């Protein structure tokens, strides 16, 4: 399969990124990164495990909910613990086993299937790397995706999409929200434009609560 947008001449793609950036008052590199983030989300939610995943975190607040302006490389995902064979209230020992099971699934199955999905979708010349871990029960696990940027790199943004997949968060409540790239939104009638797809995105109230809890944990560590 050939990706229609990537099949365009590089000069045409650069022009598209630049025009969208000028219209939205952001950098062309941010528009390019947004395209790759959108493609990554589409690939993730076309996997067999998709019904057991939700999109969460700060990037979901901007990408899915349009509540904040943020150009991040991070895609935070939560995987349903029941999918990994764990239900109900978990003891400390069970939580450790859950994290180990999640890490094993992400590194041995999810990581490989995602690479195959990229190839299937015609997303070529992309490099994947799985972040090294010190412990077998480390959660979340991180996957780095380095894409072939055609816009000059900025100091703040790198040509990388980073996926964090964790098992500790509950997947509810969530709402099906639109995922589309800025380029597709601005040029909906062009032959390269892809239709938006809805993906399960954690409700913002829960995301804000999780951020507060994380800050509390960090404060407790330094207190």
Please give the residue ranges for each predicted region.
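Helical scaffold of the NTase/Pol beta-like nucleotidyltransferase catalytic core
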Residues: 1-54, 66
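Catalytic cores of NTP-dependent nucleotidyl/adenyl transfer enzymes across multiple folds
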Residues: 5, 18, 38-41, 97-223
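Short charge-dense sequence patches
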Residues: 6-11, 54-66, 183-194
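Short secondary-structure transition/capping motifs
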Residues: 29-33, 67-68, 95, 99, ...
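Acidic side chains
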Residues: 34, 74-76, 164
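Active-site nucleotide-donor binding segment shared across nucleotidyl transfer reactions
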Residues: 45-75, 79-87
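Catalytic palm subdomain of template-directed nucleic-acid polymerases
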Residues: 79-104
């Amino acid at each position: 399969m050939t990706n229609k947008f990537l099949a365009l001449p590089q000069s045409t793609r650069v022009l598209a990124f630049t025009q969208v950036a000028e219209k939205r008052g952001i950098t062309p590199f941010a528009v390019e990164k947004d395209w790759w983030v959108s493609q990554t989300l589409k690939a993730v939610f076309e996997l067999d495990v998709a019904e057991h995943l939700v999109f969460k975190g700060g990037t979901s607040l901007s990408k899915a909910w349009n509540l904040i302006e943020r150009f991040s490389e991070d895609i935070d995902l939560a995987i349903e613990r029941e999918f990994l064979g764990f239900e109900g209230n978990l003891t400390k020992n069970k939580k450790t086993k859950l994290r180990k099971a999640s890490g094993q699934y992400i590194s041995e199955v999810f990581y490989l299937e995602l690479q195959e999905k990229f190839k299937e979708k015609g997303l070529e010349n992309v490099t994947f790397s799985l972040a090294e871990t010190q412990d077998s029960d480390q959660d979340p696990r991180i996957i780095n995706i380095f894409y072939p940027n055609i816009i000059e790199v900025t100091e703040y943004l790198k040509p990388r999409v980073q996926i964090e997949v964790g098992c500790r968060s509950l997947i509810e409540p969530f709402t099906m929200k639109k995922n589309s790239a800025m380029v597709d939104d601005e040029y909906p009638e062009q032959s390269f434009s892809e239709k938006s797809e809805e993906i399960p995105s954690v409700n913002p109230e829960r995301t804000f609560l999780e951020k507060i809890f994380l800050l509390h944990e960090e404060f407790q560590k330094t207190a």
